[in-house]
Structures are given as C-alpha cells and as structure tokens.
Amino acid sequence: VGPGGECGGRFGGCAGGQCCSRFGFCGSGPKYCAH
C-alpha cells in the first residue's frame, strides 16, 4: 500500500481485509469492492 492509500500494481494489496477500488485506492464498501 502506498503512502496515500494506493493499491494495485507496485503498491500491492490492502491490509485489514479492505478492497482495492478500480481507481487504485483502499477502502471498504461497495464502491471499493464491487468492480
């Protein structure tokens, strides 16, 4: 995970069971997980 919460590519996955949104940020909920 990057310093701004980025995920995917070189940043890798998210901690704590969070999802990576299609925009490349970690979070939870449908807007992060449903893509």
From Swiss-Prot:
Expressed in leaf, flower, stem and seed with highest expression in leaf (at protein level). Disulfide bonds join C7-C20, C14-C26, C19-C33. One of its GO terms (biological process) is killing of cells of another organism. PROSITE patterns: CHIT_BIND_I_1 (PS00026). InterPro entries: Chitin-binding_1_CS, Endochitinase-like_sf. Coiled coil: none annotated. Contains 3 disulfide bonds. Has antifungal activity against A.niger (IC(50)=5.4 uM), B.sorokiniana (IC(50)=2.0 uM), B.cinerea (IC(50)=1.6 uM), F.solani (IC(50)=3.7 uM) and A.alternata (IC(50)=5.0 uM). Binds chitin in vitro. Has no antibacterial activity at concentrations up to 10 uM. This is Antimicrobial peptide 3. It comes from Stellaria media. The lineage of its organism: Eukaryota, Viridiplantae, Streptophyta, Embryophyta, Tracheophyta.
